[in-house]
Amino acid sequence: MGNRRLAREHALQTLYYADTGKTQGKDINEYKEDFKDSLDAAGFEFCSGIIDGALEHQAELDKIISAYAKNWSLNRMSVVDRSILRMAAYEMLFSPENTPVAAVIDEAIELAKKFSTENSSRFINGLLDQIKKERKNGQN
């Protein structure tokens, strides 16, 4: 498994715990330390950037996701799907990494297939594709 994919998996797990409030008294930085040994320095920095960025921009990301989630409120989405969407939207719109948008969407789909449902992967793909098109048209 690639270092960035593993970094995204760790970021997803951390954002999931943060969203559910099941942090067991740990703060986010303690969660990051838990998986530091499984990533190289670049992977750890990438993962930390996604976590910190998605949390910092969460209100704005939620507005964007809600605008494209036809007939779906954020509260109705599974926590896993919501976390994947926040991560991917953060990477597409705010991350200084400049990861190609197609790669971000592909990684989000793979995370959904692994941690959620097949229907979720299609939903996530469609929503992120809409964000990509709007971004390309300069509307985001």
From Swiss-Prot:
MF GO annotations: RNA binding
Signal sequence residues: none
CC per GO annotation: cytosol
InterPro entries cross-referenced by the UniProt entry: NusB-like_sf (IPR035926), NusB_fam (IPR011605), NusB_RsmB_TIM44 (IPR006027)
GO aspect biological process, one term: transcription antitermination
Organism domain of life: Bacteria
The keyword Transcription is assigned to this record: yes
Residue ranges the record marks as coiled coil: none
Keywords: RNA-binding, Transcription, Transcription antitermination, Transcription regulation
PANTHER family, A to Z: ANTITERMINATION NUSB DOMAIN-CONTAINING PROTEIN (PTHR11078:SF3), N UTILIZATION SUBSTANCE PROTEIN B-RELATED (PTHR11078)
Role description: Involved in transcription antitermination. Required for transcription of ribosomal RNA (rRNA) genes. Binds specifically to the boxA antiterminator sequence of the ribosomal RNA (rrn) operons.
Similarity-based family: Belongs to the NusB family.
Record's protein name: Transcription antitermination protein NusB
Organism of provenance: Elusimicrobium minutum (strain Pei191)
Lineage per the UniProt record: Bacteria, Pseudomonadati, Elusimicrobiota, Elusimicrobia, Elusimicrobiales
